[in-house]
């Protein structure tokens, strides 16, 4: 593909059979909706858009913001002419049924991170597209069955990250022309970046393997990793994943021992599945710490899942700490700067 090529050109070349035509239509519709959402976010309070509570809660119990509701309305409107069997949204208690014989179903979070709106931080839209099998309940297959996934980042630029199952491409919104243009093709997660993203304030609640990994990073050059690490935490899933795609490192949102946090807080169908598909397509890895996220199946629309994703070596290290606790280097004197061993 050529630098600056529009998203619509890519989708036109991709749409070679009925299923792919439906996928292309869905991606194009979500992209169009995201442009409208981007404009609303950019206007902020000038357009009456704030992070104020709407007065209700979504299906997952989160307090809905004004923009959550507007973003949901925009995405549903954008998808009205797309041939889908069902829609699953963070903002809905139940599936929105379409044509049961349509070739695809779509899961999405219309506005991820809406609590960041009033602080002018990054938010986004996440989506997952799966094949529909007539007679089979939608969204019951493993995440590995996804045929397309992506997310939009509403930041200094509005960017669309997309995989159609053959690598990851990044597009940026040309605001004058109101089209997405290709800026990076076949993105690969950098393999060796000394960065990790986690909410360290929850350290006391984590399982020991997560504590062990983070403690190794904190130990830096004096510890078993033999290098200093930087910690990042934005509190926005789309921003964290975009950074890892472009800079490398690892993102952790594990389960912990707080009530209601045993499986973390991220939702499988419209957060961890699509982000994991994107990450693997970019040469990274995504795990719960014990198993591959894309091997998981959802029992409910809003099922949660831990998420550890990023550079393969770091994800594998965290998995090893879960399966073999003896791999933890807690006897620091042997591994410190002046110790006998380094790993």
Swiss-Prot record:
Assembly, per entry = Homotetramer.
Q: Which PROSITE patterns match?
A: FBPASE
Metabolic or biological pathway:
Carbohydrate biosynthesis; Calvin cycle
Q: What is the lineage of its organism?
A: Bacteria, Pseudomonadati, Pseudomonadota, Alphaproteobacteria, Hyphomicrobiales
The species this protein belongs to is: Rhodopseudomonas palustris (strain TIE-1)
Q: Where in the cell is it found?
A: Cytoplasm
Query: What residues bind substrate, as annotated?
Result: 112-115, 199
Q: What is this protein called?
A: Fructose-1,6-bisphosphatase class 1
Tell me which HAMAP family the record gives.
FBPase_class1 (MF_01855)
């Amino acid at each position: 593909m050529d630098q600056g090529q529009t998203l619509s050109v890519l989708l036109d070349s991709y749409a070679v059979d009925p299923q792919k035509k439906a996928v292309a239509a869905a991606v194009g519709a979500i992209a169009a909706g995201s442009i409208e959402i981007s404009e609303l976010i950019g206007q902020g309070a000038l357009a009456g858009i704030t992070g104020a509570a709407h007065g209700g809660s979504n299906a997952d119990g989160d307090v809905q913001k004004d923009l959550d509701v507007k973003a949901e309305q925009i995405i549903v409107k954008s998808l009205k002419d797309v041939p889908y069997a069902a829609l699953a949204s963070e903002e809905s208690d139940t599936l929105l049924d379409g044509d049961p014989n349509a070739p695809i179903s779509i899961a999405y979070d219309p506005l991820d991170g809406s609590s960041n709106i009033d602080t002018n931080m990054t938010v986004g839209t996440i989506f997952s597209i799966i094949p529909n099998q007539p007679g089979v309940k939608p969204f019951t297959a493993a995440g590995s069955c996804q045929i397309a996934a992506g997310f939009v980042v509403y930041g200094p630029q509005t960017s669309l990250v997309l995989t159609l199952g053959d690598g990851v491409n990044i597009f940026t919104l040309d605001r004058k022309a109101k089209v997405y243009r290709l800026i990076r093709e076949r993105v690969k997660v950098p393999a060796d970046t000394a960065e990790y993203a986690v909410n360290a304030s929850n350290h006391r609640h984590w399982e020991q393997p997560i504590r062990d990994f983070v403690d190794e990073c904190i130990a830096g050059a004096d510890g078993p990793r033999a290098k200093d690490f930087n910690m990042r935490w934005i509190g926005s899933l789309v921003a964290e994943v975009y950074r890892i795609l472009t800079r490398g490192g690892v993102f952790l949102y594990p389960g912990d021992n707080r009530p209601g946090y045993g499986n973390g807080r991220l939702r499988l169908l419209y957060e961890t599945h699509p982000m994991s598909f994107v990450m693997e397509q970019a040469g990274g890895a995504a795990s719960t710490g014990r198993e591959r996220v894309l091997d998981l199946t959802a029992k409910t629309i809003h099922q949660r899942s831990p998420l550890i994703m990023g550079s393969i070596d770091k994800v594998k290290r965290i998995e090893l700490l879960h399966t073999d606790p003896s791999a933890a280097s807690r006897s620091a004197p042997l591994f410190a700067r002046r110790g006998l061993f380094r790993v």
